[in-house]
Amino acid sequence: MDISISWVVIIVFVLSYLILMDKWRASKLPGNPPPSPPKLPVIGHLHLLRGGLPQHVLRGITQKYGAVAHLQLGEVHSVVLSSAESTKQAMKVLDPTFADRFDSIGSQIMWHNNDDMIFSRYNDHWRQIRKICVSELLSPRNVRSFGFIRQDEMARLIRVFESSEGAAINASEEISKMSCAIVSRAAFGSVLKDQGKLADLVKEALSMASGFELADLYPSSWLLNLLCVNKYRLQRMRGRLDNILDGFLEEHKVKKSGEFGGEDIVDVLYRMQKDTEMKAPITNNGIKGFIFDVFSAGTETSATTIQWALSELMKNPEKMVKAQAEVREKLKGKTNPDVADVQELKYLHSVVKETLRLHPPFPLIPRLCKEECEVTGYTIPAKTRTLVNVWSIGRDPAYWKDPDTFNPDRFDEVSRDVIGNDFELIPFGAGRRVCPGLHFGLANVEVPLAQLLYHFDYKLPSAMTAADMDMSETPGLSGPRKNPLIMIPTIHNPTS
């Protein structure tokens, strides 16, 4: 009995202490904090994140409490931005203040303590690798130079679709293979023998690293960090990934050039690594981190966007007919169309923009507020974790008529682009941390999509109708489809 009473006293004492600490932290919030839902002791608002994908749940919270909302997730204070106005203020007016990333167990393990570009802190290392990326690796000129790779891999994909004419094909799987091959050849100068293993690892890592870890939300708890099972899974995965990348890089050092000669992305990184005048030397882990950036951001996002575009066109047959008519008229007689050719395809551009509006590659963009500031009149404390809900902004009726409807024609009336200038549509982010690979990514979406629409007509399997299509998403950094896209391709006959 005495032991039971002692435990009750201890539990009451601990809970009382945690509640008092919780109230003390809340009282320390400066100025005019953003509105916040009622919270529970110790866990704060964690219970509100149940029951759906994070971007969906957070949209419901900001619809109720305002476009700028404060959440306490465990010990961590976070702010969600779900309007173009608040996002513009954070990413443009206060860009240097919000240019940092916050650490997580997933990013630290998979990206070697954030020694890459996507998750690096805003510092000399990030500025340097960003400059290399923009001027050397993924510039518009280099994107055009990768045209022969896109053409080669598209020819392979077309052969696969032709061989499956009249039969159901897993379009998601084949498109992912094509996207991975393009990135592999651009990065390493050749198709990798373990390319499939690398692609599977990247997909699994993105899924695992995109969740909320309790150890991230209670950073003061060494016990939660110790008991974090996902951490050990990620460490094992990181080891497997290192083994593959180390092998690729060693092979790359001894070969003279890629399959088509000239410099690939790894060549440029090795050349820069030897530059003694660089402020922040590029390490081998930094090279592996950047390659992982290219594969994770370049492979998954491009493939996912093509899959969503085809899904939306299959679900909206009248839009499919219009897109195919434009492509077949403008590209008639062009055997190997590339970036310059698709510039003429106005409706295709609208299809891609509408797809990115409804299915952004990064539904939530993480930032860290470095110092206290004000966003739309609300005080944001220093070191506050910030999540920009790109998915929610793209479906906000304040900016978009019939926001849940796939309608590429809306861009005839609304002049908005995806490069970070229009904050109603920022699938690649905005400000100084806008995705440097957006030109590479768009080329790897628009060119393959145009050719798939040009060469084939499509039907759904068995008795499925457009209304039956499952458009559900699954958790992941790139917002992928829950189920693969299965279609029946038939070769287009211009005379029929």
Swiss-Prot record:
Biotechnology comment: The monoterpenic phenol thymol is widely used as a fragrance and a flavoring ingredient in food and cosmetic industries. Its derivatives have also several biological and pharmacological properties such as antimicrobial, antioxidant, anticarcinogenesis, anti-inflammatory and antispasmodic activities. Medical applications include the treatment of disorders affecting the respiratory, nervous, and cardiovascular systems. It may also act as a growth enhancer and immunomodulator. The monoterpenic phenol carvacrol is commonly used as a fragrance and a food flavoring ingredient and preservative. Its derivatives exhibit also various biological and pharmacological properties including antioxidant, antibacterial, antifungal, insecticid, nematicid, anticancer, anti-inflammatory, hepatoprotective, spasmolytic, and vasorelaxant. Phytochemical inhibitor targeting the main SARS-CoV-2 viral protease (Mpro) and ACE2 in human host cells, carvacrol is a possible candidate for treating COVID-19.
Protein name: Cytochrome P450 71D180
Keyword terms: Heme, Iron, Membrane, Metal-binding, Monooxygenase, Oxidoreductase, Signal-anchor, Transmembrane, Transmembrane helix
InterPro entries documented for this protein: CYP450_71D, Cyt_P450, Cyt_P450_CS, Cyt_P450_E_grp-I, Cyt_P450_sf
GO CC annotations, alphabetized: membrane
Cofactor: heme
Catalysed reactions, as listed in the record: gamma-terpinene + 2 reduced [NADPH--hemoprotein reductase] + 2 O2 = carvacrol + 2 oxidized [NADPH--hemoprotein reductase] + 3 H2O + 2 H(+); (4S)-limonene + reduced [NADPH--hemoprotein reductase] + O2 = (1S,5R)-carveol + oxidized [NADPH--hemoprotein reductase] + H2O + H(+); (4R)-limonene + reduced [NADPH--hemoprotein reductase] + O2 = (1R,5S)-carveol + oxidized [NADPH--hemoprotein reductase] + H2O + H(+)
GO molecular function, a single term: heme binding
Transmembrane segments: 1-21
Pfam family membership, one: p450
Membrane topology term: Single-pass type II membrane protein
Originating species: Origanum majorana
Pathway the protein contributes to: Secondary metabolite biosynthesis; terpenoid biosynthesis
GO biological process terms on file: terpenoid biosynthetic process
Family: Belongs to the cytochrome P450 family.
Domain of life: Eukaryota
